[in-house]
């Protein structure tokens, strides 16, 4: 008889313990992203718009810069051969048929053959500045997003914190700690998303800068090589 009583007591104790153990509340990523109220949701929308533009700008510039860096290794050899043998028109046609910043620089220089070397150099430099401007088009927007993303996320966190403490004040200070903590970690979500957006834009920006510098270096080398060729013809 006592054995049954002990078993019943143990069962009651286990049930009571199960009732006192708090059930862990789970939340999906989507619920976390959209749980910041109207203000938080608007800031999240702004952050995702920034993320979309950052990815789009990066991919668009990456393809454009990649296309600009492609040039036939024999291009300058053919230019040297044409100019050395007086085939200026053939050199111009070769440049016109090659779509690259280097070919446009050389084409500008060929059009100045017969003028002073300083004038030719100036024309090539001006054409080079235009090509660099084309390469760097919209790249600065990535730098802007890399800074604006984290700041926008931080703004969302501040707004969320203000709303959480306003809710506590409106309740006369009688608010559960769990509810306050939920409001705080929801507000912190915008900072996390903002940092992710800023990091993606920052890495993309620096990668494009490195690739642009390589193309500019290639342009400078070919421009110097062309000017040396003109100097030898004198």
Predicted segments with their positions:
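Alpha-helical membrane-interface segments at transmembrane helix boundaries
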Residues: 30-43, 125-146, 177-189
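Lipid-exposed faces of alpha-helical membrane segments in multi-pass integral membrane proteins
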Residues: 42-59, 145, 152-155, 193-200
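Residue-level signature of catalytic and energy-coupling elements of molecular machines
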Residues: 37, 55, 91, 106, ...
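Hydrophobic alpha-helical transmembrane segments of polytopic membrane proteins
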Residues: 184-204
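Hydrophobic membrane-targeting segments
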Residues: 5-75
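Juxtamembrane non-transmembrane "cap" segments at the membrane-aqueous interface
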Residues: 2-20, 157-172
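Predominantly long cytosolic amphipathic alpha-helical stalk/bundle segments
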Residues: 68-175, 203-234
């Amino acid at each position: 008889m006592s054995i049954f009583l002990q078993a019943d007591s143990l069962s009651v104790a286990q049930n009571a313990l199960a009732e006192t153990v708090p059930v862990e509340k789970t939340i999906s990523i989507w619920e976390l992203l959209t749980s910041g109220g109207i203000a938080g949701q608007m800031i999240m929308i702004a952050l995702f718009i920034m993320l979309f533009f950052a990815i789009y700008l990066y991919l668009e510039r990456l393809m454009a810069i990649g296309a600009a860096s492609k040039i036939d290794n024999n291009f300058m050899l053919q230019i040297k051969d044409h100019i050395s043998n007086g085939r200026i028109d053939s050199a111009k046609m070769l440049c016109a048929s090659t779509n690259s910043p280097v070919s446009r620089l050389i084409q500008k220089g060929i059009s100045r053959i017969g003028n002073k070397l300083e004038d030719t150099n100036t024309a090539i430099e001006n054409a080079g500045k235009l090509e660099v401007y084309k390469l760097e088009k919209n790249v600065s927007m990535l730098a802007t997003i890399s800074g604006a993303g984290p700041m926008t996320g931080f703004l969302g966190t501040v707004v969320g914190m203000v709303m959480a403490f306003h809710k506590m004040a409106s309740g006369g200070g009688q608010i559960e700690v769990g509810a306050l903590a939920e409001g705080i970690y929801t507000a912190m979500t915008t900072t996390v998303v903002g940092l992710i957006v800023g990091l993606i834009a920052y890495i993309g920006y620096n990668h494009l800068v490195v690739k642009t510098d390589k193309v500019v270096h290639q342009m400078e080398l070919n421009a110097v090589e062309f000017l040396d060729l003109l100097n030898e013809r004198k």
